[in-house]
Amino acid sequence: MSWRWALARRVAALGATSGGGDGATAQAQRLFSSAAALLGRHPPPPSPPHYQIRSKVVGCRGATFVSSRWLHDAQYQVRQDGLSRSEEQQDPFELVADELSLLANRLRSMVAAEVPKLASAAEYFFKVGAEGKRFRPTVLLLMASALKFPLSDSTEVGVLTILANKLRTRQQNIAEITEMIHVASLLHDDVLDDADTRRGVSSLNCIMGNKLSVLAGDFLLSRACVALAALGNTEVVSLMATAVEHLVTGETMQISTSREQRRSMDYYLQKTYYKTASLISNSCKAVAILAGHTADVSMLAYEYGRNLGLAFQLIDDVLDFTGTSASLGKGSLTDIRHGIITAPMLYAMEEFPQLHEVVDRGFDNPANVELALDYLQKSRGIEKTKELAREHANRAIKAIEALPDSDDEDVLTSRRALIDITERVITRTK
């Protein structure tokens, strides 16, 4: 028997000795199931029930971080001011700064390649100074902390700490995998868009050419697949594979739209989900699944990521019209110059139907670009897009507020940080 299974059985034994009778035996079985899932194995015992407390979702598929009352009998009360946004906020990025540095170093080692040119291309956006804000890894690390359960004060806390550290490493792996998939999509997008800047520096295709950029993106995806397979969780593998499929689907939707589709807000939002929100939402859900949470809690994590991603892209589309090339780290008016119609222009078209004809003519002629911008300036397109972004931000915040009750300060701090990130997304200027 491996040490992993021995450890899992030890946790189950702890549950069995915490009380007598059939209830203790069933609880031990649930703990064994959770520990086994954490360590990459999936035995088939039935899932435990989950509970509803007021409007909060409470429950887990088995305790990974175990309280003295074995979690399923615990009902933690969130302090009334626990998630108050009026409290002094800590910088969300600073909360996980040490882990982000660790992840950055691991990512640089993970993308090393035997062929020097491929290695140089693959590590281009992982080099110090070019790695960007690391927005997605930050969100995922904070989500992992926001979903954790407190360790007990028992004498067996050392065993539980081993499990906790093991889980944290696996959740860090999700952050690494997500960032590799994201960077791969950027490399491919820059080739498709013939972009010359990214993150304030020259794009890889501009420096090394399209062929090497495409190969570097493929290489990153292959490394992400290897890391994903190593987790040994088929549900998580399926989620992340779906996110990659959505990236391809969204990009295809963008480059092959009909006239009717270009005018459709529903089509735009579906494409935006595929291109931007699917990766972060499914990654948030993967973090919850690895921790052994119920489907309800995992869906709250997903909903947070989905609405955060949509809000992020809506503001990004606003900034394409209102920002500068220097502030955005890429060219402004990029979308419209490529004939891509986004929310601000869609709202302007609703307000000024004559704009449809301008859009249908395309934007190869600079005069059409200027005419479309004139209509946009007269409309409420920018304002209505910001309002829609706020709606999605509010939904993301509600998802965090509906997470299982906890009185753990680290958990509450992380949840406040996720709410803070949401507010930053819709108030950013770059």
UniProtKB/Swiss-Prot annotation:
Binding residues annotated for Mg(2+) 1, in chain numbering: D189, D193
Residues reported in the UniProt entry to bind isopentenyl diphosphate: K133, R136, H182, R199
GO biological process, one term: isoprenoid biosynthetic process
Pathway listed: Cofactor biosynthesis; ubiquinone biosynthesis
Reactions it catalyzes: 7 isopentenyl diphosphate + (2E)-geranyl diphosphate = all-trans-nonaprenyl diphosphate + 7 diphosphate
UniProt entry keywords in alphabetical sequence: Isoprene biosynthesis, Magnesium, Metal-binding, Mitochondrion, Transferase, Transit peptide
Short name of one Pfam family: polyprenyl_synt
Transit peptide: 1-31
Entry's family note: Belongs to the FPP/GGPP synthase family.
Function per UniProt: Involved in the supply of solanesyl diphosphate for ubiquinone-9 (UQ-9) biosynthesis in mitochondria. Farnesyl diphosphate is the preferred substrate.
Protein name, per record: Solanesyl-diphosphate synthase 1, mitochondrial
